[in-house]
Amino acid sequence: MDSLHIGSYTFSSRLILGTGKFSSPGVMLEAVKASGAQLVTVALRRFNREQPGDDLFTPLTSIPGITLMPNTSGASTAAEAVQAARIARELSGSPFIKVEIHPNPQHLMPDPIETYEASKILAKEGFLVMPYIPADPVLAKRLEEAGCVSVMPLGSAIGSGQGLATAEMLKIIIRESTIPVIVDAGLRSPSEAALAMEMGCDAVLVNSAVAVAGNPPVMAEAFAEAVAAGRKAFTAGIMEKSGMAVATSPLTSFLGTEA
């Protein structure tokens, strides 16, 4: 089986699903089930068992095969992210943490300096750190060296639906990385997820494109199928582009060349 390996964990699905923006917890749960995702990210504020309306922890962990990846969304500094990660591990018991630090609410770009500092600390504390980062090959390599178990470069701005605007940088990160590269943010359609996988990404994380769809569970299923197809195409070996036409059948001796 062509499995996804992150740290000591193995997943058969290469689609990771976010849980924000859904119209209701019920719709979100149906989408998670339809997606077949095994790794799901949840904001710290959704770990609230005393407020059932805000609690996603209990219903998500009732789905067989689900592993939670808490995230530090809302943190604007490394110190805030580290504190949030420690609380999340205590509440969830999960070793995974998605380090997400975007101090400017206007564009939500991840802060590379604060992200690196937080990731370095958390990796030393035994977390399985998966940082959300700009599509920066140098930063990605530094985070790998700091002990992160994957890097999650953005395709484009969170919730923008602008697709793989960073494709050329993603290709460099994929080529140089020895840990999983997971495209996170900006994907609008299943075809973009398939393209990311064809490029050689190890997985994709999708949230808004599923959450705001007319039928989130069906869209989640479509993304799952696209991710699987893209991965299959990548492993099969995609043909190289050519600057000129290349005949599929030899054109010599067409119906014989005798006079």
Curated annotation (Swiss-Prot):
Can you state which reaction this protein catalyses?
Answer: [ThiS sulfur-carrier protein]-C-terminal-Gly-aminoethanethioate + 2-iminoacetate + 1-deoxy-D-xylulose 5-phosphate = [ThiS sulfur-carrier protein]-C-terminal Gly-Gly + 2-[(2R,5Z)-2-carboxy-4-methylthiazol-5(2H)-ylidene]ethyl phosphate + 2 H2O + H(+)
Q: Which Gene3D superfamilies match?
A: Aldolase class I
Q: Which GO terms describe its molecular function?
A: thiazole synthase activity
- Residue intervals passing through the bilayer: none
Name the Enzyme Commission number(s) assigned to this protein: 2.8.1.10
Give the UniProt subcellular location, in the record's own words. Answer: Cytoplasm
Q: Which GO terms describe its cellular component?
A: cytoplasm
Q: Which GO terms describe its biological process?
A: thiamine diphosphate biosynthetic process
Query: What InterPro entries does the database record attribute to this sequence?
Result: Aldolase_TIM, Thiazole_synthase_ThiG, ThiG
Q: What PANTHER family does UniProt report for this protein, alphabetically?
A: THIAZOLE SYNTHASE
Function, in words: Catalyzes the rearrangement of 1-deoxy-D-xylulose 5-phosphate (DXP) to produce the thiazole phosphate moiety of thiamine. Sulfur is provided by the thiocarboxylate moiety of the carrier protein ThiS. In vitro, sulfur can be provided by H(2)S.
UniProt lists the family membership as follows: Belongs to the ThiG family.
- Listed name of the protein: Thiazole synthase
Q: Which organism is it from?
A: Chlorobium limicola (strain DSM 245 / NBRC 103803 / 6330)
Tell me the lineage of the source organism.
Answer: Bacteria, Pseudomonadati, Chlorobiota, Chlorobiia, Chlorobiales
